[in-house]
């Protein structure tokens, strides 16, 4: 069984690695799009919205509902990518905890 000092050292090491991974995620951009890429949304890994882009074909004042639906699709697709990358990068730390 590990002594307390070794457990604390290992926990501090894991914390530094996790902070580094979180910073890498925050610096990464994730883009999601709607059907036919008419709307794209880009977020950082810490879920800050960077941009929403609309193709001219989708902007129709008489059909705002379609634009809204496509925007939601693009945002949700981008956030799903962020969540998947976060789980992949940070989920590995859960199994490494010394206790």
UniProtKB/Swiss-Prot annotation:
Main location: cytoplasm
Pfam families: YbaB_DNA_bd
GO molecular function, one term: DNA binding
Keywords attached to this entry: Cytoplasm, DNA-binding
Localization per record: Cytoplasm, Nucleoid
SUPFAM superfamilies reported in the protein's UniProt record: YbaB-like
Subunit record text: Homodimer.
Protein purpose: Binds to DNA and alters its conformation. May be involved in regulation of gene expression, nucleoid organization and DNA protection.
HAMAP family, per database record: DNA_YbaB_EbfC (MF_00274)
Protein name: Nucleoid-associated protein SSU05_0194
Source organism of this protein record: Streptococcus suis (strain 05ZYH33)
């Amino acid at each position: 069984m590990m002594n307390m000092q070794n457990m604390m050292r290992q926990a501090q090491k894991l914390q530094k690695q996790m902070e580094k991974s979180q910073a890498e995620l925050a610096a990464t951009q994730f883009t999601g799009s709607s059907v036919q890429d008419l709307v794209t949304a880009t977020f950082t890994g810490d879920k800050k919205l960077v941009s929403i882009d609309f193709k001219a074909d989708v902007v129709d004042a008489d059909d705002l509902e379609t634009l809204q639906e496509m925007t939601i699709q693009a945002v949700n697709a981008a956030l799903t990518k962020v969540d998947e990358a976060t789980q992949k990068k940070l989920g590995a730390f859960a199994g490494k905890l010394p206790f």
